[in-house]
Curated annotation (Swiss-Prot):
GO terms for molecular function: DNA binding; DNA-directed RNA polymerase activity; metal ion binding. DNA-dependent RNA polymerase catalyzes the transcription of DNA into RNA using the four ribonucleoside triphosphates as substrates. Largest and catalytic component of RNA polymerase IV which mediates 24-nt short-interfering RNAs (siRNA) accumulation. Implicated in siRNA-directed heterochromatin formation through the action of DCL3 and AGO4, and subsequent DNA methylation-dependent silencing of targeted sequences. Essential component of a self-reinforcing loop coupling de novo DNA methylation to siRNA production. Its EC number is 2.7.7.6. SMART domains: RPOLA_N. It comes from Arabidopsis thaliana (Mouse-ear cress). The lineage of its organism: Eukaryota, Viridiplantae, Streptophyta, Embryophyta, Tracheophyta. This is DNA-directed RNA polymerase IV subunit 1.
C-alpha cells in the first residue's frame, strides 16, 4: 500500500529567467537519443512511450508518468536555409548591392570626384535595381526567395529605348543545375539555398549579426523528431494487442528520411512538417487560403495556439474545487455559504496535527476508519497509510469540509474585485445546490435563476490567512470601484424599509415590538404613544421607531433630499422617498461604515431579518387589479383618454422638431395655407420621410421621449397608494415605471435598432396592414423595383393589458425582441482582457509610487487616493482599475446599440482605443466659445450659429436651381474659348438666406479651381467665370430674381476643342461639388451641449454646462493635419473661439499639438464622460491610472498586443511569454527566438505559470543580508529597542528658524546621547520642546565624541559604519550642508586641513570629488537650537578666530 502512495520527487531549483533561441545543429544532436536513418525508426521504441513494445528502450520505463519521451534527429544530405530566417535574409539582401556587397544606396551619376562603383550601383548603366522577396507572405509556405527587377527602374529603361536586360545582368548568381532558367521570365529568378549562401559570403559579418542575431542557426542540416507521445492520436485495442495510430507528422517524418530531391523541395517538406506542430497550428484556417495546401481538416489538432497556452500552460487544475447552482437562504448570515453535506464529504482540507486539534481531527476520521480501516497522511514529503495510534505531531491530515472552514467563492466572469469573497462554511442537509444570503447577490452580480458559483478550498496556511485578511466579506465592505458600500438592503428588505417609514398608520403594539426586537441588536425605545384612545390603554410604537432600533447609539446621519435626520441613533424625521435606503451616494449604510465598520454586517443582517418578519406580518401581494391602476371604470376611461391626448401631443412635438430642420423649412412656406382635409396626408408624409432619414428619426425619438414623460407620470396620478407595483417602484426594489406603463397604459414608442427594407405606417391598425401603399410593402414611388432603406419608427397605443392587434404585435416583435447586443456581446470581454493585460502588473510600491513590475518602471509618482498611502502598499492597483472599467463595459450591454442613439459601450471602446494608429476616415474637433460672447444677449447662441455658418461646407449644387450647357461660340476674343458655355441659375432669395452674394460665389469658384485644377485632368488653360442678371438662353427664368453664373473654358489653342461629354461628365460635377462657403474637408458641424464636468472649465461660469461645436472633418490631409487645416479656416473668426480649451478629439493628434499632459487631461475627461454614460460611477484614481498606464512611454499606445509590445520595447523589458499569453503565441515565441531574447519573468502571469511568486502584494519577497562589517556590540541588544530607536533625519536648511518651526530629531548619535533621544517618535518636534529634552551637557558630549572619532583614525582613512553614520547625521547641521554634500555622500574620511596642520573630516562624494568640513560648525548648529545662549561660549572655547555672521560662521572649512 505504501508503494501505491509513493510520489515522484520534483527537482528543486530557483528559476530566474527563460531564454528563447532557434536551435542549431549542435543543439539538435545533443538532445537526440537516436539518429533516424530508416522510415520505420520514426516510431522507434527509443523515442519513448507509447510504442509497440510498451517499454522505453532509452530509460527502460513502462509508465508514461516517469518517461516524458525522447527526441530523435533526421540528418539531411545537404544544408538548407532555416525557413524561419527567409524573411530576414531577403531583407538583408535588399540592403546590399549584389555586385560589390556594400550597403545599397540610391544610384548616382558618376562624376570625376566620385569613386568608381559597380554597375549595379551606378545610374544610367542599363542595370536596374532589383528586389528580393520570399515566395509568399505566409510563414508556412516560405520555401524560397525570389529576386525580381524593380518595375519602376525597368520602366525608366524602356522610356530610354532599352527593352531588354543586359546579358550579364544575372551574373552575380552562381549557376545551379536544379533551376531551369529557360522557363522563367527574364526579369525574375528563383534563388536556391546554395545561391543564397553564395550571396551572403562577402557581406560584412557585423551587418549580418545586426539583422540576423541567431546567424549560427541559419543553416539547417538536421530536423528533430518529436517523442512518440506527442504524435499518437489514438490507441486501438485488438485481439493481438494494442495498435497505435500516429498523426500526419509521422508520415511527413518518413518522407524526410533519406530525401534526395533539391533544396527547394526539401524546404517545402520541412515547412509542411512544421505546419502540424501543436504550437503553430493556430494559423491553420478553414478558408481557401490555408497555410498548408496539403492539409486535411481531420488532421488539424483540436488544441491549438492560444487555446493551448491557456488550457495547458496557464490552466491550474485542483481537486479541491466545486461548482454548483446557487439558491437563496435568508437564514444564513451574510458571511456564510451553505454547502450540501454530500459535497462537503468529498472536499478535503489539509491541517497539521498538534496537541490542540488532535482530538477533533481524530473524531472527524472515525467514519473513514470504519470504512477503510486506515488513513493517509503526509509525513514529510511522503504519503503514508497509518492507523490512529501511529499519528504523530506535525502530520498533515486530510479531513472533510466542516462548519467554520473558509472557502473562496466566485461567480464567473470575475469582472471586478469583489466577485471573489472568502466565506464561512455551514453544512446544510440539502443536495446539489449551495445556499447564499440574498443580500450577497449584489457583489457576485448574480441572482437565483440558475446562476452557478465556483468554490475553492484553501489548503496551505498562507492561503487561509490571505483569504481571512484580504477577501473576507468584512474586509470588502467598501466597494473599491466607487468608494461606496458594497452591500445594501435586498428587494424584500428595501420594500419593507420604505413602507415601515412611509405608512402613516404603521403602529405596533408591545407584543409586536417584542417579537421584532429579537432580530434587532439594540434596545427597545420608549413608546411614542402612551395611550392611543380611551378604549385602548396599550402603548404604541411607530414604524420610524422600529427602523431606528437598527441604528447604534451615537450614530448621527442626515440626508437632505428625503429630509432624513438621525440623531444619537434615533430616527427623528423622514419624508416620502427611498433614495437614502437604496444603493446610492450618501445612503445610511455608507454612513454606518464610517461610524462603526465592525458592526455593519450584523446591522444589515438584523435589518433583513426584522424587516422581512415585519413585511410577513403586514403582507404584500400583486394581483391583476394592480395592473388596472384605476379603482373604477370611469377613472380607467379618463386615464385612457389622457393617454391618447398625451400621445397626440408627443406626435405634434416630433413634427415641430422635424419642421425645424432646414430641409423642411420650405414646407411651411408652401403649405402654410393648405386645407384642413390635407392634414392627414401631410402627417403620413411626415411619418414616411422620418423613417427614411436616420437624422430625422433620431430627432423624433428624442423629442417623443421628452414628451412621453408626461404620459408616464399618469401612473402616479391614477394609481392608488396601496398599489403594490407603485410601492415597489417607489421603494426601488423591483422593476421600473416604464415596464408598468407598457403593461397597464400603452407600449409607446417602438423604433428599430437597425435599418430595414420596410417601414411602419403612421397608424398601426389592421387597415394599414392590408394597405398596398403602406411602407410595410417596402419601396414607394414610381420605380417600385428599387430597394430603400428605412429606420422603422412607430407608436403602439395599446398596452399588454388591453391586447395588441396583429400589426402592433409585429412591430413590437421587430423592434423589441431583437437581440440588441448580440453583435457586440464579446466586446466587454475583449476590453476586459486587454485592460487586464496592460494593467495586471501595476502595483503600489513601498516608497509611495505606483510602478510596473516589468523593470520596476515608474507609472505614477503618487497614487491619488483619499486614504493613507500605507493602506494600499503592495496592492495590485492596475488590476483594480482594469476591473472597474470592465464592470462598466459589462453594464453597458443592457443599453441598446442602435442607429438612433449613441452606444455607451462603443463610445467607451473608442475612448480606450484612442492610441491606435489605424487611419480614420473622419476626425472630430471640439471648439469652445470665447468668454467675450457672454457680454451680448444670447451671445453664445448667435456665436455658435455664426461659427457653424462659417465652417460648414456649402456646395455650389445646394444653391443652384438650374444648370445647362449652351452652344454659343465667340470669334472676337483674343484667347481661344470653348463654344460650350455652362449656365447656372441661382435665386437671390437663396443667396440672401445663405448670406452669400453673386460676387462671393464667383470668387469661391475661382479659388477652388486654382487649388484643385489637377483633379480635373483636362487639357484646359483656365476657366472664365462671370455672373450676370440676364441669361441669353432663358430670359423668362431671370424675371424671378435669379442670378446667372456662366463658366467658359479657356482652350489651350484654337485647334483643340474640349468635347461636350468632358464638360458634362467632368467639369460640371466638379463645379457643383465645389464649396462656395466653408471648407472642403469639413463634413459637418454640430452645435451640442455639454455638462460642466465633461468640458474644460471656464472661469467664473456658474452654469451647469455650455454650448460647444463638434466639427467633423475628412481624415488626415497628408502633411497638413486636420487641426492645422481647421486653424487656417478659422482665421476670420479667431476671436469667437476659446483656443485655450478647444482641442482635437483624437488623442494622438491632441498630444502632437499641445503635448502629452494636455492629451492626458482630454483622455481622462473623455473616459469619465464615457463611463458616466454607462450609468456607473468610478473613482477618479482608476481613470487616472488607466491614462498613465497607456501613456507611460510619453505617447498613448494602442490597447492591443502591439501597443503593449511597444511599451516593453521602449522600457527595454522584453516579455515574450506574457505577450504570447495574450495573442499569437507562435509569432511571439518565433520573434523572441530569432532575436535571442531572455525573459526575466517579471510579470504576474508568467511568474505563476512557471511556479514563481509574483513580486508584489503578499508575494513580495525580501531577503535579510548580513553585512560583513563588525558592528561592535559587546553585549546582547534588544532588537526591537534598537529598531525603534533608529530614526531617519531629514536634511535641514541653513536659514535661521523660529521657535515655531520644526526640525527632525537626531538619530543614533552616540551611546551617551541615545538614552535621551530614544523617547522621540521620529516626527517633527518644535524647537521649544527640544530644549526641554536636550541640555548643554548633551552638546558637550556630542562635541567630545566627534573629537574622539577625528583623532582615532589615520589620514585618508575611512570611518567605520557606526562612526560614519554619526558624522553623516551631524553634517546635516552644518550651515552649508547642501554645498558640502553635493551630489551625494559615498563615505566620510579623516583628512589634513587645507588651512593648517590640523585634521578635519572630509566628504567623499559619489562623483569622486572631496569636500572638507569642520565638525565645530555642526555642533554650533546644534547649540543654536538647544542652547542659543551658549553659542558665544562655544565659539570662544573652540573657535579662536570665529565670529558670528548672518547665516554662518567665518571659520574656513
Amino acid at each position: 500500500m505504501e508503494d501505491d502512495c509513493e510520489e515522484l520527487q520534483v527537482p528543486v531549483g530557483t528559476l530566474t529567467s527563460i531564454g528563447f533561441s532557434i536551435s542549431n545543429n549542435n543543439d539538435r544532436d545533443k538532445m537526440s537519443v537516436l539518429e533516424v536513418e530508416a522510415p520505420n525508426q520514426v516510431t522507434d521504441s527509443r523515442l519513448g512511450l507509447p510504442n509497440p513494445d510498451s517499454v522505453c528502450r532509452t530509460c527502460g520505463s513502462k509508465d508514461r508518468k516517469v518517461c516524458e519521451g525522447h527526441f530523435g534527429v533526421i540528418n539531411f544530405a545537404y544544408s538548407i536555409i532555416n525557413p524561419y530566417f527567409l524573411k530576414e535574409v531577403a531583407a538583408l539582401l535588399n540592403k546590399i548591392c549584389p555586385g560589390c556587397k556594400y550597403i545599397r544606396k540610391k544610384q548616382f551619376q558618376i562624376t570625376e570626384d566620385q569613386p568608381e562603383r559597380c554597375r549595379y550601383c551606378t545610374l544610367n548603366t542599363g542595370y536596374p535595381l532589383m528586389k528580393f522577396r520570399v515566395t509568399t507572405k505566409e510563414v508556412f509556405r516560405r520555401s524560397g526567395i525570389v529576386v525580381e527587377v524593380n518595375e519602376e527602374s525597368l520602366m525608366k529603361l524602356k522610356k530610354r529605348g532599352v527593352l531588354t536586360l543586359p546579358p550579364d545582368y544575372w551574373s552575380f548568381l552562381p549557376q545551379d543545375s536544379n533551376i531551369d532558367e529557360s522557363c522563367l521570365k527574364p526579369t525574375r529568378r528563383i534563388i536556391t539555398h546554395a545561391q543564397v549562401y553564395a550571396l551572403l559570403l562577402g557581406i560584412d559579418q557585423r551587418l549580418i549579426k545586426k539583422d540576423i542575431p541567431m546567424f549560427n542557426s541559419l543553416g539547417l542540416t538536421s530536423f528533430p523528431v518529436t517523442p512518440n507521445g506527442y504524435r499518437v492520436t489514438e490507441i486501438v485495442h485488438q485481439f493481438n494487442g494494442a495498435r497505435l495510430i500516429f498523426d500526419e507528422r509521422t508520415r511527413i517524418y518518413k518522407k524526410l528520411v533519406g530525401f534526395e530531391g533539391n533544396t527547394l523541395e526539401l524546404s517545402s517538406r520541412v515547412m509542411e512538417c512544421m505546419q502540424y506542430s501543436r504550437l503553430f497550428s493556430e494559423t491553420v484556417s478553414s478558408s481557401k487560403d490555408s497555410a498548408n495546401p496539403y492539409q486535411k481538416k481531420s488532421d488539424t489538432p483540436k488544441l491549438c495556439g492560444l487555446r493551448f497556452m491557456k488550457d495547458v500552460l496557464l490552466g491550474k487544475r485542483s481537486d479541491h474545487t466545486f461548482r454548483t447552482v446557487v439558491v437563496g437562504d435568508p437564514s444564513l448570515k451574510l458571511n456564510e455559504i451553505g454547502i450540501p453535506e454530500s459535497i462537503a464529504k468529498r472536499l478535503q482540507v489539509s491541517e497539521h496535527l498538534n496537541q490542540c486539534n488532535k482530538e477533533r481531527l481524530v473524531t472527524s476520521f472515525v467514519p473513514t476508519l470504519l470504512d477503510n480501516k486506515e488513513m493517509h497522511v503526509r509525513r514529510g514529503d511522503r504519503l503514508v497509510a497509518i492507523q490512529v495510534n501511529d499519528l504523530q505531531t506535525g502530520d498533515k491530515i486530510f479531513r472533510s469540509l466542516m462548519d467554520g472552514d473558509t472557502v473562496l467563492m466566485n461567480r464567473p466572469p470575475s469582472i471586478h474585485q469583489h466577485s471573489l469573497i472568502a466565506m464561512t462554511v455551514r453544512i446544510l442537509p440539502t443536495t446539489s445546490v449551495v445556499s447564499l444570503n440574498p443580500i450577497c447577490c449584489l457583489p457576485f452580480r448574480g441572482d437565483f435563476d440558475g446562476d452557478c458559483l465556483h468554490g475553492y478550498v484553501p489548503q496551505s496556511i498562507q492561503a487561509k490567512v490571505e483569504l481571512d485578511e484580504l477577501v473576507a466579506l468584512d474586509k470588502q465592505l467598501i466597494n473599491r470601484q466607487n468608494g461606496r458600500n458594497l452591500l445594501s438592503l435586498g428587494q424584500d428588505s428595501l420594500t419593507a424599509a420604505y413602507l415601515v417609514n412611509v405608512e402613516k398608520n404603521c403602529y405596533l403594539n408591545r407584543a409586536q415590538m417584542q417579537q421584532l426586537q429579537m432580530y434587532c441588536p439594540f434596545q427597545l425605545p420608549p413608546p411614542a404613544i402612551i395611550k392611543a384612545s380611551p378604549s385602548s390603554t396599550e402603548p404604541q410604537w411607530t414604524g420610524m421607531q422600529l427602523f431606528g432600533m437598527l441604528f447604534p447609539p451615537g450614530f448621527d446621519y442626515t440626508y437632505p433630499l428625503n429630509n432624513v435626520v438621525v440623531s444619537n441613533g434615533e430616527l427623528l424625521s423622514f419624508s416620502e422617498g427611498s433614495a437614502w435606503l437604496r444603493d446610492g451616494e450618501g445612503n445610511f449604510i455608507e454612513r454606518l461604515l464610517k461610524h462603526d465598520k465592525g458592526k455593519v454586517l450584523d446591522i444589515i443582517y438584523s435589518a433583513q431579518e426584522m424587516l422581512s418578519q415585519w413585511l410577513l406580518m403586514r403582507g404584500l401581494s400583486v394581483s391583476l387589479a394592480d395592473l388596472y391602476l384605476s379603482s373604477d371604470l370611469q377613472s380607467r376611461k379618463n386615464l385612457t383618454e389622457e393617454i391618447s391626448y398625451g400621445l397626440r401631443e408627443a406626435e405634434q412635438v416630433c413634427n415641430k422638431q422635424q419642421l425645424m430642420v432646414e430641409s423642411w423649412r420650405d414646407f411651411l412656406a408652401v403649405n402654410g395655407e393648405d386645407k384642413e382635409e390635407d392634414s392627414v396626408s401631410d402627417l403620413a408624409r411626415f411619418c414616411y420621410e422620418r423613417q427614411k432619414s436616420a437624422t430625422l428619426s433620431e430627432l423624433a425619438v428624442s423629442a417623443f421621449k421628452d414628451a412621453y414623460r408626461d404620459v408616464q407620470a399618469l401612473a402616479y396620478r391614477y394609481g392608488d397608494q396601496s398599489n403594490s407595483f407603485l410601492i415597489m417602484s417607489k421603494a426601488g426594489s423591483k422593476g421600473n415605471i416604464g415596464k408598468l406603463v407598457q403593461h397597464s397604459m400603452c407600449i409607446g414608442l417602438q423604433n428599430s435598432a437597425v435599418s430595414l427594407s420596410f417601414g411602419f405606417p403612421r397608424e398601426l391598425t389592421c387597415a394599414a396592414w392590408n394597405d398596398p401603399n403602406s411602407p410595410l410593402r417596402g419601396a414607394k414611388g414610381k420605380d417600385s423595383t428599387t430597394t430603400e432603406s428605412y429606420v422603422p419608427y412607430g407608436v403602439i397605443e395599446n398596452s399588454f393589458l388591453t391586447g395588441l392587434n396583429p400589426l402592433e404585435s409585429f412591430v413590437h416583435s421587430v423592434t423589441s425582441r431583437d437581440s440588441s447586443f448580440s453583435g457586440n456581446a464579446d466586446l466587454p470581454g475583449t476590453l476586459s482582457r486587454r485592460l487586464m493585460f496592460f494593467m495586471r502588473d501595476i502595483y503600489a510600491a513601498y516608497d509611495g509610487t505606483v510602478r510596473n513590475s516589468f523593470g520596476n518602471q515608474l507609472v505614477q509618482f503618487t497614487y491619488e487616493t483619499d486614504g493613507p498611502v500605507e493602506d494600499i502598499t503592495g496592492e495590485a492597483l492596475g488590476s483594480l482599475s482594469a476591473c472597474a472599467l470592465s464592470e462598466a463595459a459589462y453594464s453597458a450591454l443592457d443599453q441598446p446599440i442602435s442607429l438612433l442613439e449613441t452606444s455607451p459601450l462603443l463610445n467607451l471602446k473608442n475612448v480606450l482605443e484612442c492610441g491606435s494608429k489605424k487611419g480614420q476616415r473622419e476626425q472630430t474637433m471640439s471648439l469652445y466659445l470665447s468668454e467675450y460672447l457672454s457680454k451680448k444677449k444670447h451671445g453664445f447662441e448667435y456665436g455658435s450659429l455664426e461659427i457653424k455658418n462659417h465652417l460648414e461646407k456649402l456646395s455650389f449644387s445646394e444653391i443652384v436651381s438650374t444648370s445647362m450647357i449652351i452652344f454659343s461660340p465667340s470669334s472676337n476674343t483674343k484667347v481661344p474659348l470653348s463654344p460650350w458655355v455652362c449656365h447656372f441659375h441661382i435665386s437671390e432669395k437663396v443667396l440672401k438666406r445663405k448670406q452669400l452674394s453673386a460676387e462671393s460665389v464667383v470668387s469661391s469658384l475661382n479659388e477652388q479651381y486654382k487649388s484643385r485644377n489637377r483633379e480635373l485632368k483636362l487639357d484646359i488653360v483656365d476657366l472664365d467665370i462671370q455672373n450676370t442678371n440676364h441669361c441669353s438662353s432663358d430670359d423668362q427664368a431671370m424675371k424671378d430674381d435669379n442670378v446667372c453664373i456662366t463658366v467658359t473654358v479657356v482652350e489651350a489653342s484654337k485647334h483643340s476643342v474640349l468635347e461636350l461629354d468632358a464638360i458634362r461628365l467632368v467639369l460640371i460635377p466638379f463645379l457643383l461639388d465645389s464649396p462656395v462657403k466653408g471648407d472642403q474637408g469639413i463634413k459637418k458641424v454640430n452645435i451640442l451641449w455639454t455638462d460642466r464636468p465633461k468640458a474644460p472649465k471656464r472661469n467664473g461660469n456658474h452654469l451647469a454646462g455650455e454650448l460647444y461645436l463638434k466639427v467633423t472633418m475628412y481624415g488626415d490631409r497628408g502633411k497638413r493635419n486636420c487641426w492645422t487645416a481647421l486653424l487656417e479656416t478659422c482665421l476670420p473668426i479667431m476671436d469667437m473661439i476659446d483656443w485655450g480649451r478647444s482641442h482635437p478629439d483624437n488623442i494622438r493628434q491632441c498630444c502632437s499639438v499641445y503635448g502629452i499632459d494636455a492629451g492626458r487631461s482630454i483622455f481622462v475627461a473623455n473616459l469619465e464622460s464615457a463611463v458616466s454614460d454607462t450609468g456607473k460611477e468610478i473613482l477618479r484614481e482608476h481613470l487616472l491610472l488607466v491614462a498613465d498606464s497607456l501613456s507611460v512611454t510619453g505617447e498613448f499606445v494602442a490597447l492591443n498586443a502591439k501597443g503593449w509590445s511597444k511599451q516593453r520595447q521602449v522600457e527595454s523589458t522584453p516579455a515574450p511569454f506574457t505577450q504570447a499569453c495574450f495573442s499569437s503565441p507562435s509569432q511571439c515565441f518565433l520573434k523572441a527566438a530569432k532575436e535571442g531574447v531572455r525573459d526575466d519573468l517579471q510579470g504576474s502571469i508568467d511568474a505563476l505559470a512557471w511556479g514563481k511568486v509574483p513580486g508584489f502584494g503578499t508575494g513580495d519577497q525580501f531577503e535579510i543580508i548580513i553585512s560583513p562589517k563588525v558592528h561592535g556590540f559587546t553585549t546582547p541588544v534588544d532588537v526591537y529597542d534598537l529598531l525603534s530607536s533608529t530614526k531617519t533625519m531629514r536634511r535641514t536648511n541653513s536659514a535661521p528658524k523660529s521657535d515655531k518651526a520644526t526640525v527632525q530629531p537626531f538619530g543614533l548619535l552616540h551611546s551617551a546621547f541615545l538614552k535621551d533621544i530614544k523617547v522621540l517618535d521620529g516626527k517633527g518636534i518644535p524647537m521649544s520642546l527640544l530644549r526641554t529634552i536636550f541640555t548643554w551637557k548633551n552638546i558637550e558630549l556630542l562635541s567630545q565624541s566627534l573629537k574622539r572619532i577625528l583623532h582615532s583614525y589615520e589620514i585618508n582613512e575611512l570611518l567605520n559604519e557606526r562612526d560614519e553614520g554619526l558624522v553623516k547625521m551631524v553634517l546635516q547641521l552644518h550651515p552649508n550642508s547642501v554645498e558640502k554634500i553635493g551630489p551625494g555622500v559615498k563615505g566620510i574620511r579623516v583628512a589634513k586641513s587645507k588651512h593648517g596642520d590640523s585634521c578635519c573630516f572630509e566628504v567623499v562624494r559619489i562623483d569622486g570629488t572631496f569636500e572638507d568640513f569642520s565638525y565645530h560648525k555642526c555642533v554650533l548648529g546644534a547649540t543654536k537650537i538647544i542652547a542659543p545662549k551658549k553659542m558665544n561660549f562655544y565659539k570662544s572655547k573652540y573657535l579662536k578666530n570665529g565670529t558670528l555672521e548672518s547665516g554662518g560662521f567665518s571659520e574656513n572649512p
